[in-house]
């Protein structure tokens, strides 16, 4: 009688481990959630893991108790990412300093961003396990130029000389992202680390962070009456937060991914977005006229062809983006359910402007004269 073959048990499949910087922020936290759902072990870096108020939304994620660890790290501290990156196969670098009111932008924003990027690459090299680094870049690396174009792709670069000469709002952020991305491309090549940069436009959608995300201050300015942000969306490009995070993972996992990728699914001028919001959410007063903005503006498009040609598919519409953002803001009491009075009857009236400060504090019904709260030391 032939003896029955006995098979040794299969060795356990190693669970991949990745590091996410800026994990407590708008993009970082959603990316962590999606990675955990896929079974990744995630090393999430934050500035202060002991600040329960700022990390609670991460600790409450499904699988967080088994697959998530928090690590203290700071872009301004050399080598502070070493421990978090040790043992990781991949790194998603989402964190970035954003202080638009800095008195010394060169030393407080630009240099820390570039040094932080290079420090992370050095940490990857020390770990000797990291095969791929995915960097969340910015549309500010593409289209900040004196002569605006109607079409941009991954070969486009903003004009640094123009940025330094004009010093427009947020100029130090644009400059820091450009310099960091270019420096990273060179350094990663020297260290034999695959480097991918993902360039998102305005990111809109639901969120799990406790406070109001900076990009939604811009996207929802049509509702809040924050006129200073209208110029940003007069010829806007958009992507849903979930599509963006799925693209991060898609490119990390795709063996042939390399270089820069734009991740933008929609483009529209401000009048078309305002019309959509008015029709879908009539309870909000949304302007029909925008002073100084031509109704016949052409759209400016960002091409995601390189990304979609690799097989990535966008899932969400522009309406989906706004619905996710508005629903979440309402649930978190960061946005009122209406900006019209009972006597308004749907006719145009002066908007109730709501400042970023009121959003963050939850004072959603406090009327404020057109007030712009600059972004300061936030995590994207």
Swiss-Prot record:
Q: Where does NADP(+) bind?
A: 54, 173
> Member of which family?
Belongs to the NAD(P)-dependent epimerase/dehydratase family. Dihydroflavonol-4-reductase subfamily.
> Main EC class of this protein?
oxidoreductase
At the top level, the lineage of the source is Eukaryota
Q: What does this protein do?
A: Bifunctional enzyme involved in flavonoid metabolism.
**Gene for this chain:** DFRA
Q: Which key words are in the record?
A: Flavonoid biosynthesis, NADP, Oxidoreductase
Q: What is its EC number?
A: 1.1.1.219, 1.1.1.234
- Which Gene Ontology MF annotations are present? dihydrokaempferol 4-reductase activity; flavanone 4-reductase activity
The reactions it catalyses are: a (2R,3S,4S)-leucoanthocyanidin + NADP(+) = a (2R,3R)-dihydroflavonol + NADPH + H(+); (2S)-flavan-4-ol + NADP(+) = (2S)-flavanone + NADPH + H(+)
One Pfam family, short name please?
A: Epimerase
Q: In which pathway does it act?
A: Pigment biosynthesis; anthocyanin biosynthesis
Among InterPro entries, the record links this protein to:
Epimerase_deHydtase (IPR001509), NAD(P)-bd_dom_sf (IPR036291), NAD(P)_dehydrat-like (IPR050425)
Q: Where is the signal peptide?
A: none
User: Could you tell me the Gene Ontology terms of the biological process aspect for this record?
Assistant: anthocyanin-containing compound biosynthetic process
Tell me what this protein is called: Dihydroflavonol 4-reductase
């Amino acid at each position: 009688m032939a003896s029955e073959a006995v098979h040794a048990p299969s060795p356990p499949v190693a669970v991949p481990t990745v590091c996410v910087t800026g994990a407590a922020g708008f993009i970082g936290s959603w990316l962590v959630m999606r990675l955990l759902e896929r079974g990744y072990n995630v090393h999430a870096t934050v500035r202060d893991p002991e600040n329960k108020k700022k990390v609670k939304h991460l600790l409450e994620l499904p699988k967080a108790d088994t697959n998530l660890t928090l690590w203290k790290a700071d872009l301004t501290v050399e080598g502070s990412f070493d421990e978090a990156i040790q043992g990781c196969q991949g790194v998603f670098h989402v964190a970035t300093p954003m202080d638009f009111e800095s008195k010394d932008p060169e030393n407080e924003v630009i240099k820390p961003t570039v040094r932080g990027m290079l420090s992370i690459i050095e940490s990857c090299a020390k770990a000797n396990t990291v095969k791929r680094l995915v960097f969340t870049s910015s549309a500010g690396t593409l289209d900040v130029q004196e002569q605006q174009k109607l079409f941009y792709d991954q070969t486009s670069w903003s004009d640094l000389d123009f940025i330094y000469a004009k010093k427009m709002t947020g100029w130090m952020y644009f400059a820091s992202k450009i310099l960091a991305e270019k420096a990273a491309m060179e350094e990663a090549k020297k260290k034999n680390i695959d480097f991918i940069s993902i360039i998102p436009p305005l990111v809109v959608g639901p969120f799990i962070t406790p406070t109001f995300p900076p990009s939604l201050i811009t996207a929802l300015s049509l509702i809040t009456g924050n006129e200073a942000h209208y110029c940003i969306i007069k010829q806007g490009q958009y992507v849903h937060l979930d599509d963006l995070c799925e693209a991060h993972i898609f490119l990390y996992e795709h063996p042939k991914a390399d270089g820069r990728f734009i991740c933008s699914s929609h483009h529209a001028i401000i009048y078309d977005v305002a019309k959509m919001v008015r029709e879908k959410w009539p309870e909000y007063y949304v302007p029909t006229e925008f002073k100084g903005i031509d109704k016949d503006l052409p759209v400016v498009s960002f091409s995601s062809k390189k990304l979609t040609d690799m097989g990535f598919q966008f899932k969400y519409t522009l309406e989906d983006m706004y619905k996710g953002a508005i629903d979440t803001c309402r649930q978190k009491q960061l946005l009122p359910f209406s900006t019209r009075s009972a006597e308004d009857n749907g006719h145009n009236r002066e908007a109730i402007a709501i400042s970023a400060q009121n959003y963050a504090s939850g004072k959603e019904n406090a009327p404020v004269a057109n007030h712009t709260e600059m972004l300061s030391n936030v995590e994207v």
